[in-house]
Amino acid sequence: MAIECSYYLEDLDTRELPRRFLEAFAAILSHSNYAPLLDAASRVGLRCSRCAVTCPVYQASGDRRDIPCDRSALLLEVYKRYFTLRGNLSARFGKSFVLTEDYINRMAEEFYRCTACRRCKKECPLGIDHALITRLGRWILAEVGITPKALVVATREQLEGETHNTSAIPAAAMKDTCEFLEEDCADEHGLEIEFPVDAEGSEYVFFPAVSDYLLEPDTLMGGAAVMKATGGSWTIGTRNFDGINYGLFYSDRLLGRIVSAEVDELRRLKGKKILIGECGHASRSAKVGIPTFCGGKNAPPVINIMEYTHKALVDGRLKVKSGAISERVTYHDPCNIARSKWIINQPREILEAICKDYVD
């Protein structure tokens, strides 16, 4: 069975692939806390498929392989056979599951059909986190060389390339963009904004999704306008100005390296707090990853731009025009920052303050 999508930059080494997969699986279990999750999930015989009701992928495809509990069963089958006493005994005394290259290819295809939105966890009567199991499967696959090309290219450039960001934007180009946005904001909106660069000792070091410099200039201008209006002390670093962290989607090891690089930039600039842009996955990876990999309780605080804006609004440091937006507006919760009950009410209260017809 061939993998339907092209995953590799280099040719995949398929020699003893099942053995290498199991070795990677064993190493991850030894150096992480995934074992209790898998042990609990593997003891549950229930596959009621209630998760299918909330899965947007299954609702669109109708394909049974997109039912979250069925996808989780692929990795749990491997775990039960090779990492539990019952599985080892059944292999000795009778027929049992055998991991093959075709089975690994099937996992590679099906694990990357999941968006990892984690809606299924909310529906599961036993609270099984199918997205987390899927992500663990992706991590094991990554350790044996099976990862989608786009993720590999972007992450390599971020960690090992000259630009240290996923879009390969040179620092000089980033600074040119910021200067242009300052002029554009003044011309279009009559607002004087600034993008401080490499300003040591700032309270906040800003890490937006680097793609904002190419695709979402209004988002950057809005953030700069808020910082200007509130007198915020902030800066953008030239050695690392990318909050994107694709490790969140497929590798704890790489997630840790990326958030560590953010903390290194914070320390280089003698900043106090990390300020993340509106990007959901960039926010979640920093909020969860920095305490995990960079000092625990002593890790630098991580603030999302919506949290900063909301606090400034509540404190009276940010003045807005009530009813400035007359059109009907609603808010779609980003799964990465709302599913964990982190940022829910703040954006709604901001919108209510500036929208004439906000509907929730």
Model-derived features: positions:
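Iron-sulfur (Fe-S) cluster-binding modules
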Residues: 1-53, 57-60, 69-70, 74-83, ...
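Short acidic, glycine/proline-enriched helix-loop-strand junctions
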Residues: 283-306
